[in-house]
Amino acid sequence: MRKLLLFIFLLPLLFSQRGLSQPVDSIDFYMLTCEPGNEVYSVYGHSAIRVVVRGTGRDIVYNWGLFDFDTPHFAFRFAKGKLDYMVGACSMKTFMEEYRVEKRSVWSQKINLTNGEKINLINRLDENMRQENIYYRYDFFYDNCATRVRDIIENSLTGSVSYPVEENEKTFRELIDQCQQRIPWLDFGADFLLGLPADKKATVRDEGFLPMLLMKNLGSATVNHSGKREPVMSSPSLILDMRDVAEKKPDVWILPLILYSLLVLVVLITFVFGIPILGKVSDWILFSLLIILSSQLEI
């Protein structure tokens, strides 16, 4: 996270329309999709935008998945999906190394943009990277690292975007259940914390809150360019294949069940019954339990 934050105030200078000396047609944009990881906060995957300025060595990744561990009630806000997240950026080399270490595969899709749309996207990235805009209120279904990528791409396009039609729409709960089939405690925890809003039907566009589905659905979407419908982006290309080297963890359920019971107990005591547990200490208890739980399971 420290490496990512180093670039927060540098990127507007690197890629703003004013500071860009290269012709816009020498800039390429890509959507990156990272497979789910072995931690609670990475189990659903990740999305980012890559910007390459050919002939300059500039190769930067914009990432809306950063958060501050010092946020009050961090663990509860995180689990509930109501945490303040932030945008940052790093070099493509740094970004890829992180996923290589975590043994998580990465896919890339080139975004199909006119020169005018490229300028739109540059300006939107520049706007996002301003100090007053780097924080946003995370929402699990409607405003996360994947939906931010989707929205900034859609809003940069000058034509209308059409998604493929899906006859049997799933609920948000059914979609996340698919991600948690081998993690019963997390499945139960999500049901406990997300409540009734998770039972709403999700459109194909809505499904983009999950990075792997965003890769599929936005990759199948089309945009109207001068009366002609064209793909929004290319088919996914696997640029980091870690599927055969990912570590597998044994199925150990007793400890997770005990720890999850403690997690529920802390949440009930602190937030339902209103009994404070040493203030910020309860945050660290919650987050520690989440991390320990995730480390016990095969994701």
List the predicted regions and their residue ranges.
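Bacterial Sec-dependent N-terminal signal peptides
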Residues: 1-22
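Generic ordered-secondary-structure signal
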Residues: 13, 18, 139, 197, ...
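Soluble extramembrane regions of membrane proteins in the secretory/endomembrane system
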Residues: 22-245
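Alpha-helical transmembrane segments forming the membrane-embedded cores
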Residues: 244-299
